[in-house]
């Protein structure tokens, strides 16, 4: 679809479900993203926030939806939408989603969803898209794909003044994002696409959010893609609670080995964000801190049972940082460094998950954090 065609479709949707709609609101939109709200009755929270990522290959590939909620019923709705490949159209997906949410909260079907079956009005919001020949259309689409980022930069900001998705990101990190985009396009052209569109788009969003984050910019942690893979990250925890024994250990480690961080490996599967990343400690060897054999982490957050597709990767990183300190993690100086490896970490992780699935997870008293 051409940029002007996608823009017309988004404006059409926003004209139906504006920011004052009684049931479903499109709060803001860009060519690659929708920010929406669904209004639900008490006792549920009054506003349910949903996000939709629109891929460059839309409508050949389906938009990706996720929700800011831990409710498994909501996750189930989005998983069913993801599993349904019958229609990639934003309009039809939006209709299905609104109807399912109304059904979930025992609300009557809203009449406005029927408007989504209508064809796009000619010249919607001043947009005219006359195609005089197939050749012209193909030429336009090729230019749109090549220069998509430039069109996005020129796109009118929504009413709420939302800034460019690259706002607040340093030049060196923008270069990394651009390198990934080019690599993905080349892989697509070569028919050698790795991962899934859903996971790749979400991981790109997570990476952009991290690059904008103050925690990242102030050096609490850093992120590096392994072999430029969007699905394999090295995360360095560079700052922990200065009053913790772990902080003191890291100072000693710096003097002895020149290492002043905890290195984590995050690996993501094709079905991310519906499944959690697999996270393990690479170095140094730690005791305590809920670190298992091989470097795996004993955290319900990192299991299917405790995971939510709404969780951001930065929140996971910060939670791991806090959990290591809370669990009184200590550096094991002189330990065999080869004891931490992927195979052993996966084995430890699978064993602990089976135990907790059978016996449940321990929830510490509130005074313990």
Swiss-Prot record:
Matching SUPFAM superfamilies: UBC-like
Bias-annotated ranges (Acidic residues): 131-143
Localisation per UniProt entry: Cytoplasm
GO biological process: protein K48-linked ubiquitination
Active site per database record: 298 (glycyl thioester intermediate)
Keyword ATP-binding: yes
Catalysed reactions listed for this entry: S-ubiquitinyl-[E1 ubiquitin-activating enzyme]-L-cysteine + [E2 ubiquitin-conjugating enzyme]-L-cysteine = [E1 ubiquitin-activating enzyme]-L-cysteine + S-ubiquitinyl-[E2 ubiquitin-conjugating enzyme]-L-cysteine
EC number: 2.3.2.23
Induction notes from the record: Up-regulated in pregnant endometrium during implantation.
Role according to the record: Accepts ubiquitin from the E1 complex and catalyzes its covalent attachment to other proteins. In vitro catalyzes 'Lys-48'-linked polyubiquitination.
UniProt xrefs under PANTHER family: UBIQUITIN-CONJUGATING ENZYME E2
Family per record: Belongs to the ubiquitin-conjugating enzyme family.
Protein name: Ubiquitin-conjugating enzyme E2 Q2
């Amino acid at each position: 679809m051409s940029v002007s065609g996608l823009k017309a479709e988004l404006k059409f949707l926003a004209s139906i479900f504006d920011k004052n709609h009684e049931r479903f609101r499109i709060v803001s939109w860009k060519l690659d993203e929708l920010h929406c709200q669904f209004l639900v009755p008490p006792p549920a929270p009054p506003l349910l926030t949903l996000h939709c990522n629109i891929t460059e290959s839309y409508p050949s590939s389906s938009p990706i939806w996720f929700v800011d909620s831990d409710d498994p019923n909501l996750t189930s709705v989005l998983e069913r939408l993801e599993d349904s490949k019958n229609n990639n159209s934003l309009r039809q997906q939006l209709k299905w989603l609104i109807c399912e949410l109304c059904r979930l909260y025992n609300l009557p079907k809203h009449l406005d969803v029927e408007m989504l079956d209508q064809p796009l009005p000619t010249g919607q919001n001043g947009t005219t898209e006359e195609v005089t020949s197939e050749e012209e259309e193909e030429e336009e689409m090729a230019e749109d794909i090549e220069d998509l980022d430039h069109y996005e930069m020129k796109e009118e900001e929504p009413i709420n003044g939302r800034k460019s998705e690259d706002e607040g990101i340093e030049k060196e990190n923008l270069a990394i994002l651009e390198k990934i985009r080019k690599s993905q396009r080349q892989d697509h052209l070569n028919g050698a696409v790795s991962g899934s569109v859903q996971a790749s788009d979400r991981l790109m969003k997570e990476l952009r959010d991290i690059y904008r984050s103050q925690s990242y910019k102030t050096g609490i942690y850093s992120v590096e893609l392994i072999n430029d893979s969007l699905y394999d990250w090295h995360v360095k925890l560079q700052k922990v609670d200065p009053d913790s024994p772990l902080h003191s250990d890291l100072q000693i480690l710096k003097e002895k080995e020149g290492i002043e961080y905890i290195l984590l490996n995050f690996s993501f599967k094709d079905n991310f964000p519906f499944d959690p990343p697999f996270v393990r400690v690479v170095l140094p060897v730690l005791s305590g801190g809920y670190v298992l054999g091989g470097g795996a982490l004993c955290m319900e957050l990192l299991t299917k049972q405790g995971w939510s597709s709404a969780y951001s990767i930065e929140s996971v990183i910060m939670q791991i940082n806090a959990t290591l300190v809370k669990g009184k993690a200590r550096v094991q100086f002189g330990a065999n460094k080869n004891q931490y490896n992927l195979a052993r970490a996966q084995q430890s992780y699978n064993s602990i998950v089976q135990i907790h699935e059978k016996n449940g997870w321990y929830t510490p008293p509130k005074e313990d954090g």
